Amino acid sequence: MARIAGIDIPREKRVEIALTYVYGIGLTRSKLILANTGVNPDTRVKDLSDGDVQKLRGATEEFTLEGDLRRKEGMALKRLQDIGCVRGRRHRMSLPVRGQRTRTNARTRRGSRKTVAGRKK
């Protein structure tokens, strides 16, 4: 397995797809990296030469990936919560942040239903 950005990428997959196993690299960024390095996207990871792997490592170093990216995103959310803005409060309460309705739906964000006892008449 080739290690890129501290992640072992799968040997049997095409390089274009295997790079997406690194947090912070999607398909678009993967294609950009391969175009810049001149590596064929259809090559399997196991068939890459050491030189190709070194090129890919060098190209990925210019991006914020893995732990640094997770930390950066976490700090952005923490900042929103600390300043007390609406988005931060919604994150803290585990509610949808971008204006979606919550009277019905929003089950993914709010979690499973909590049963409330009905009133007798």
From Swiss-Prot:
Keyword presence, Transmembrane helix: no
Q: Does Ribosomal protein appear among the keywords?
A: yes
SUPFAM superfamilies assigned to the protein according to its UniProt record, in alphabetical order = S13-like H2TH domain (SSF46946)
Q: Which GO terms describe its molecular function?
A: rRNA binding; structural constituent of ribosome; tRNA binding
Q: Which Pfam families match?
A: Ribosomal_S13
Q: Which GO terms describe its biological process?
A: translation
Q: Would you name any one GO CC term?
A: small ribosomal subunit
Q: Which domain of life is it from?
A: Bacteria
Write out the entry's keywords from A to Z.
Ribonucleoprotein, Ribosomal protein, RNA-binding, rRNA-binding, tRNA-binding
The UniProt annotation puts the region (Disordered) at: 91-121
Per the record, where are the segments of Basic residues compositional bias?
100-121
State the NCBIfam families in the record: uS13_bact
Q: What does this protein do?
A: Located at the top of the head of the 30S subunit, it contacts several helices of the 16S rRNA. In the 70S ribosome it contacts the 23S rRNA (bridge B1a) and protein L5 of the 50S subunit (bridge B1b), connecting the 2 subunits; these bridges are implicated in subunit movement. Contacts the tRNAs in the A and P-sites.
| HAMAP family, A to Z | Ribosomal_uS13
User: Record's family?
Assistant: Belongs to the universal ribosomal protein uS13 family.
The record's note on quaternary structure and interaction partners says: Part of the 30S ribosomal subunit. Forms a loose heterodimer with protein S19. Forms two bridges to the 50S subunit in the 70S ribosome.
User: Can you name this protein?
Assistant: Small ribosomal subunit protein uS13
Please tell me the species this chain comes from: Prochlorococcus marinus (strain AS9601)
